Amino acid sequence: MVKLFKQETTTVGVEADVTSSRGCPAAAQAPDVSGALISGVPVSAPLVLSIDAMGGDRGPAAVLDGIALARRKYPDLHFLVHGPEADVAPLVKARRLKSCVTIRHATGVVTMHDKPAAVMRGGKDTSMWSTIDAVRDGAAQVAVSCGNTGALMAVSMLRLRKMPGVNRPAIAAFWPCKNPSGFNIMLDMGADVKAEARDLLTYALMGSSYARNALGLDRPRVGLLNVGTEEHKGHAELKIAAEMIGAMETAGGYEFVGFVEGNDLPGSRVDVIVTDGFTGNVALKTGEGTAKFAGELMREAFTSSLLSKLGALLASGALKRLKAKIDPRRVNGGVFLGLNGTVIKSHGGADATGVAAAIDLAARLAGLGFAERLAARVALASANGQDAASAEAGIENAK
C-alpha cells in the first residue's frame, strides 16, 4: 500500500503545505517503501541523481539494471553515473539509457575492504568521491552508492560537511512493523558507535523530519531504545536524553512515547526509534539474520514432504506477500542524515530490484527538497528551542 506523501508543516498547528520547497507540486505519493515500482509518479523537475556505478558486490551491471528499472517509474529523471567509462558505457548502451545517463569518468574504485582513512587520503579519483562531489557542486540533488559504508560516510562528511548543530550524523533506515504504513524509521544504524544525549536529541529531530517526509506522518511518535520502558532503567546518558527529547516534543513536532524495548521494533507503538549506532547496527544485523533464518526454516518445512509441498502451493499467495514484506531489497536504502546534502546507502549486495528501490527513495526525497527541510529542523536543536516550523517557513518564503 502506498500512502499519501506529505511534507513538513510550515506553521505549527496548520495543515501541511501543498507545494514542495522547489516551488513545484509535491509528489503525490509516499516513497514506495515496498520497493514495487508503479507507473509514473510526478516528481518535481528537473531532478538529477548521482549514482556510484562501482563498489557494490554485483558490479556496475546490477546498478545499471536498477537504473533501467527505476526509469519505468521516472521517465524524466536524469542520472550522473560515476565509474570507468570503458566499463560503464557499454552497459548504458546495452540498456538504451543514453538519453537519461551522463557518465562521469572515474578510474578508482572503493572496495569493501578499504579503510575510510585511506579513502579520505587517496580516494579523489574514485567513483564514490565523484558521486558525492556531484551533490556538493549542485550538479545532482541526491547521491546513491552501494559501496563501503564507512568509506561512504567518511567521504560524505569530508565533502559535504555536517549541518550546523549536528555533532554526529546518523544513518536512518526503514524497519518492517505493524504500523499502518508497514514501516517505522530507526536511527542510528551504524554511522557512529557513540552518541551523547545531545546527539540522541538531534537524532529524534532528524528522524521525525524524515518520518514526516518519507511516511507522511503529521506528528510522528518517537521512542528512545532502552533495556526497559521504566524511567529508572538505562544508563545516565539515556535518562538525560529522554528528558531533552521530551522537553523538545512540542517544538519538534513529534510525540515522545518514552523508552521503548527491542520487542517494540516490529510493533505499532512508535514511528521513530532513536538509538546509538552500535546498538542500531547490532539490531539491524540481528533482524536481517533472523529474517533469513526464518525464511530458510519455512522453505525447509514446505519442501519436506509431498503434503507440505501441496500446502505451500495452496498458501502461495500469502507466502509471496510475506516474502515481499520482509524482503530487504524492497526497503533498500539507508539515508545519511545530518549532512549538507542527501546521501543514500544501498545494500552492498543489492540487485536491480534493490538498486531501483534506493533510486525510488532518492527521487522522492529530491522532489521534496528534503535536505533543506531537514536543515531547518536540525536548526531547532542548535537554536535552543527555536520553532522549527518557523524556520522552515522562512526557507519557503526565501525561495
UniProtKB/Swiss-Prot annotation:
It is found in: Cytoplasm. It catalyses: a fatty acyl-[ACP] + phosphate = an acyl phosphate + holo-[ACP]. One of its GO terms (cellular component) is cytoplasm. One of its GO terms (molecular function) is phosphate:acyl-[acyl carrier protein] acyltransferase activity. Its main location: cytoplasm. Coiled coil: none annotated. One of its GO terms (biological process) is fatty acid biosynthetic process. Its EC number is 2.3.1.274. Keywords: Cytoplasm, Lipid biosynthesis, Lipid metabolism, Phospholipid biosynthesis, Phospholipid metabolism, Transferase. Pathway: Lipid metabolism; phospholipid metabolism. It comes from the Bacteria. Homodimer. Probably interacts with PlsY. Belongs to the PlsX family. This is Phosphate acyltransferase. It comes from Rhodobacter capsulatus. The gene is plsX.
